[in-house]
Swiss-Prot record:
Belongs to the AIR synthase family. It comes from Burkholderia cenocepacia (strain ATCC BAA-245 / DSM 16553 / LMG 16656 / NCTC 13227 / J2315 / CF5610) (Burkholderia cepacia (strain J2315)). Its EC number is 6.3.3.1. Pathway: Purine metabolism; IMP biosynthesis via de novo pathway; 5-amino-1-(5-phospho-D-ribosyl)imidazole from N(2)-formyl-N(1)-(5-phospho-D-ribosyl)glycinamide: step 2/2. This is Phosphoribosylformylglycinamidine cyclo-ligase. The lineage of its organism: Bacteria, Pseudomonadati, Pseudomonadota, Betaproteobacteria, Burkholderiales. It comes from the Bacteria. It is found in: Cytoplasm. Keywords: ATP-binding, Cytoplasm, Ligase, Nucleotide-binding, Purine biosynthesis. InterPro entries: PurM-like_C_dom, PurM-like_C_sf, PurM-like_N, PurM-like_N_sf, PurM_cligase.
């Protein structure tokens, strides 16, 4: 076989010439190993770097059911690029998945991440992964693996995308599916830390229209920091609450807001009637509504409006649940009740 012909004096090509820096990838792994190590918990078998990550389901479960979730951070990343602020989006990534699986009653066990970029910036990627590890610590799950994909030409320089994957476990007899929710039950609302990770396409449009000084003071911090506040993780206080009383249903308030997420846990024939005066609308949402001219109904179906998690309990358990969650550091309000659905009515109404 004849050797392939090449241009005279042409040098051989390397992967680096094609835009992929293997050495940078190795440097990133070295940087993030200490972050991942801090998240280790019972059940982790082996360390980062294997072809597959191993995890043994804790022996305390008699009939464990695995619960999985995956999500991203959405266009909040575009604001992170604009601000060159990458330290909080990792927690956002973890929160979006662990809060979702928590709703089924699951204890998060482990987490994996996917970081994709056009050109790998080791320091930026390490900052993001450090935030992911911090989110894992807050939720008690192990960061046991991930993928860093450097793909020249796929993303502009300085930009990246994230995806996260969480797996948890719940005792089969303790799965929370909303089937026991009944008329007269109480809807509790746990305060959000801010916008969380949904609605940022509208947020960015409002910023474009208002053209604010993002470095200006906004209630004790910069407007940029208020906008980028990481999604609150509710895992530990709610797992503790489940050990003390019957939690009938939960809804993670993400895309679709209160009016589209609470119905996901209600049986047909039941409606959650929410009182919008039962909790204060945080200043950031007031700012967004004012500068964007956003109608109330649109606010309720795009943003969390200050409520990051809804928890449904019996009326008899409501006060005890509020006391327990407050003692754990959460802000909680009775935001509504469950009643029979009226003809032609949605399953969540805000009055």
């Amino acid at each position: 076989m004849n050797p392939p012909k090449s241009a005279p004096d042409a040098q051989g090509l390397s992967y680096r010439d094609a835009g992929v820096d293997i050495d940078a990838g190795d440097a990133l792994i070295d940087k993030i190993k200490p972050f991942a190590k801090k998240t280790l918990r019972d059940g982790v078998l082996g360390g980062i770097g294997g072809f597959g990550a191993l995890f043994e389901v804790p022996k305390k479960y008699k009939e464990p059911v695995l619960v999985s979730g995956t999500d991203g951070v959405g266009t909040k990343l575009k604001l992170a690029f604009h601000l060159n602020k990458h330290d909080t989006v990792g927690q956002d990534l973890v929160a979006m998945s662990v809060n979702d699986i928590l709703v089924q009653g699951a204890e998060p066990l482990f987490f994996l991440d996917y970081f994709a970029c056009g050109k790998l910036d080791v320091d930026t990627a390490a900052t993001v992964v450090k935030g992911i590890a911090q989110g894992c610590e807050l939720s008690g799950c192990a960061l046991i693996g991930g993928e860093t994909a450097e793909m020249p030409g796929m993303y502009p320089d300085g930009e990246y995308d994230l995806a996260g994957f969480a797996v948890g476990a719940v005792e089969k007899s303790k799965i929370i599916d909303g089937s026991t929710i009944a008329e007269g039950d109480v809807v509790l609302g746990l305060a959000s830390s801010g916008i969380h990770s949904n609605g940022f396409s509208l947020v960015r449009k409002i910023i474009e229209r208002a053209n604010p000084d993002l470095s200006a003071d906004f209630h004790g911090r910069s407007l940029a920091d208020a906008l980028m506040a990481p999604t609150r993780i509710y895992v530990k206080p709610l797992l503790a609450l489940m050990q003390k009383l019957s939690v009938k249903g939960m809804a993670h308030i993400t895309g679709g807001g209160l009016v589209e997420n609470i119905p996901r846990v209600l049986r047909e024939g039941l409606t959650a009637e929410l009182d919008q005066n039962a909790w204060p609308l945080p200043p950031l949402f007031k700012w967004l509504q004012e500068h964007g001219g956003v109608a109330d109904a649109e606010m309720h179906r795009v943003f969390n409006c200050g409520i990051g998690m809804a928890v449904i309990v019996s009326a008899a358990d409501a006060d005890a649940a509020i006391a327990d969650l407050t003692a754990a550091g959460e802000q909680v309000w009775k935001i509504g009740t469950v009643r029979a659905t009226r003809e032609g009515e949605a399953q969540t109404v805000v009055v």
